[in-house]
UniProtKB/Swiss-Prot annotation:
The lineage of its organism: Eukaryota, Metazoa, Chordata, Craniata, Vertebrata. One of its GO terms (biological process) is proteolysis. GO terms for molecular function: aspartic-type endopeptidase activity. Inhibited by pepstatin. Highly thermostable. Enzyme activity is maintained up to 45 degrees Celsius. Active at 50 degrees Celsius but with reduced catalytic activity. Residues 76-393 form the Peptidase A1 domain. This is Cathepsin D. Monomer. It is an enzyme of class 3 (hydrolase). Acid protease active in intracellular protein breakdown. Keywords: Aspartyl protease, Disulfide bond, Glycoprotein, Hydrolase, Lysosome, Protease, Signal, Zymogen.
């Protein structure tokens, strides 16, 4: 019996040691920062939310170039290192894209976004390998551009060898000037990777850095507590969830795309009738969907439009708002008014904004719903590359 207990405790220790933990910090989104300064994000960026998802999906297995979303509503970031010794960068761990990029020391002096962030210096790394392939991701009316380089990428205790990444020498628009993060680390499938670069997690898998080829997100929605969240590579942590995971298969291995059976606003409105496709996206704060359906949802919860595509409700009504439910894989996931309404302070006043926004993603990629942090904050989410599935459990 003693030997059995010893084996059990050894296995538990191995499981804990095998998990790579990356603390996540929550920051005020770019949209909120711009709004606080009296600027309209849409005016400054001349951008379209759907750019990232406006993709074609060819019959072949050739990589599909993606276009960068604007990250106006990204809220969580963590730290990685590039090079030897590691040069620190803060990045959005984004399940809605597949490339890693950071600003380059060789960026233009006129690139204000670059000047305000950490920059990769290949000359200070003993493991740098030159590549030089042109790297560009379309971004609104301009493009984020630079070239590929190869170096060691450090995430927590993991050192990923020979990781290709983009050194950005040009970052368009105001978004990245206001950003609290330096770059993006994409965690979606290789199919949407620009230049066919192997995503970081694919290299983690091929180099056998984790025991299980899964990663999971805990996103803390309480603004008054720390940490902001945690990304775990190699498994899940029961301290962040209750009950069991319910899994649903990935329907298209590009984004983390799944099938949603139906949605409902209380008993007064049905959405996604007959089923619909959705992306689980850690790099998006809100829940988005086809504008016609989202407009009906906003009406059902008594929300009225603001000038930036956002909707607001009377804060006094939040406790009595209808529950919004999502049926996925036969399992019902619910969000209460307190969970899908975002309370923000602007000019000393508290506003209650809807956590839903209309977004029309054209075919062949769309139409799509996007389950961002408003959803993931309530349901601890695991992304399983071994079984190509996504799992949800109630977050603590």
């Amino acid at each position: 019996m003693k030997m059995l207990l010893l084996c059990v405790f050894s296995a538990l220790a191995l499981t804990n040691d095998a998990l790579v933990r990356i603390p996540l910090k929550k920051f005020r989104s770019i949209r909120r920062q711009l709004t606080d300064s009296g600027k309209r994000a849409e005016e400054l960026l001349a951008d379209h939310h759907s750019l990232k998802y406006n993709l074609s999906f060819p019959a072949s297995n050739a990589p599909t170039p993606e276009t960068l979303k604007n990250y106006l509503d990204a809220q969580y970031y963590g730290e990685i290192g590039l090079g030897t010794p590691p040069q620190p960068f803060t990045v959005v761990f984004d399940t809605g894209s597949s490339n890693l990029w950071v600003p380059s020391i060789h960026c233009s002096l006129l690139d204000i976004a670059c000047l305000l962030h950490h920059k990769y210096n290949s000359g200070k790394s003993s493991t740098y390998v030159k590549n030089g392939t042109a790297f560009a991701i379309q971004y609104g009316s301009g493009s984020l551009s630079g070239y590929l380089s190869q170096d060691t990428c450090t995430i927590g205790d993991l050192a990923i060898d020979s990781q290709l990444f983009g050194e950005a020498i040009k970052q368009p628009g105001v978004a990245f000037i206001a950003a609290k993060f330096d770059g993006i680390l994409g965690m979606a499938y290789p199919r949407i990777s620009v230049d066919g670069v192997a995503p970081v997690f694919d290299n983690i898998m091929s180099q056998k850095k984790v025991e299980q080829n899964v990663f999971s997100f805990y996103l803390n929605r309480n603004p008054d507590t720390e940490p902001g969240g945690e990304l775990l590579l190699g498994g899940t942590d029961p301290k962040y969830y209750t009950g069991d995971f319910n899994y649903v298969n990935v329907t298209r291995q590009a984004y983390w795309q799944i099938r949603v059976d139906s949605m409902a606003v209380g008993d007064q409105l049905s959405l996604c009738t007959g089923g619909c496709e959705a992306i689980v996206d850690s790099g998006t704060s809100l829940i988005t969907g086809p504008s016609v359906e989202v407009k009906a949802l906003q009406k059902a919860i008594g929300a009225f439009p603001l000038i930036q595509g956002e909707y607001m409700v009377n804060c006094d009504t939040v406790p009595s708002l209808p529950v919004i439910s999502f049926t996925v894989g036969g399992q019902v996931y619910t969000l209460t008014g307190e969970q899908y309404i975002l309370k923000v302070t602007q000019a000393g006043k508290t506003m209650c904004l809807s956590g839903f926004m209309g977004l029309d993603i054209p075919a062949p990629a769309g139409p799509l719903w996007i389950l961002g942090d408003v959803f993931m904050g309530q349901y601890y989410t695991v992304f399983d590359r071994d079984a190509n599935r996504v799992g949800f459990a109630k977050a603590k």
